[in-house]
Design a protein with these regions (language model features):
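Glycine-rich, acidic/polar active-site loops that bind/position phosphate-bearing ligands
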Residues: 1-68, 73-257
């Protein structure tokens, strides 16, 4: 019955131009997941709300009920939304996509560090954007993710930033299979880890985007996206002002960045 219902609402979604790429069960009994294909933020937000309406209407035809409450049953896993967020240029270049050698990819590191700064400075705003009453029954002590905002970067990126912060020379040697990365004279050999491994992080980097995992299942994601856009925009503006000041003082751009 559930499979038939999901196929039907997927068909209705396709008719409205909403593309879906995932269909599988989740941890709780009769809990299932679908994932719209990514697109521009405003369009993705509209499609997300339209999809919720479609699911409710199609469920009635199948004599089912879709529950969007974040924690409808005590002691059973609740529901949420994973908001995948990245930033691209007008020509489609993903500014959060690392190169083959992340320590040399100045553009990636600049934008990545600006996002980290934004989350560090405005973590209370991020939490406020998802702090509904029903979602509070899910976050924190009840189940992952925790209510405390943090970013999981993976050991490779963490090591790169630690090295830069310590003002040591960053050298790297990547073999043809990219099986290991060495940053000489700073940290030991590390194996590339899956940045998606830590499923408890509420704001995790997953290869070429950040995944905000604390959004409630009944929420309009517009608030969360608006907050992320705003705090990152502020961080980038201040980053640009800082670099411009160093350039005005005589430093070249690469050194200033």
């Amino acid at each position: 019955r559930v499979s038939s219902f999901m196929k039907d609402f997927e068909t209705e979604a396709y008719k409205l131009g909403i593309l879906l790429q995932t269909r599988h069960n989740e941890v709780a009994p009769n809990q299932f997941e679908c994932a719209p294909v990514f697109c521009e933020a405003t369009k993705a937000i509209d499609q997300n709300m339209m999809l919720m309406i479609i699911m409710q209407k199609v469920a009635e035809k199948h004599h089912l009920k879709v529950i969007f409450h974040e924690k409808p049953f005590d002691g059973v896993n609740g529901s949420g939304k994973h908001c995948n967020w990245s930033i691209t240029t007008d020509t489609g270049v993903n500014l959060l996509s690392p190169g083959k050698t992340p320590t040399k990819n100045l553009q990636f590191l600049s934008f990545y560090s600006s996002v980290l700064r934004a989350v560090h400075r405005h973590h209370y705003l991020l939490m406020a954007s998802v702090a509904t009453l029903s979602n509070s029954y899910r976050l924190g002590g009840n189940e992952a993710p925790p209510a405390v905002m943090s970013v999981f970067s993976g050991s490779t990126l963490y090591g790169v930033f630690q090295t830069i912060m310590n003002m040591k020379d960053v050298k790297e040697s990547v073999d043809s299979r990219q099986e290991s990365i060495k940053i000489v004279n700073s940290i030991p050999e590390i194996f590339p880890d899956n940045t998606d491994r830590n499923r408890t992080s509420p704001f995790a980097f997953t290869g070429n985007r950040f995944e905000f995992r604390a959004v409630g299942s009944s929420q309009n994601v517009a608030t969360a996206v608006c907050v992320v856009n705003s705090i990152v925009a502020e961080s980038l503006r201040e980053f640009r002002a800082y670099v411009d000041a160093l350039e005005a003082a005589g430093e070249d751009r690469s050194s200033a960045v």
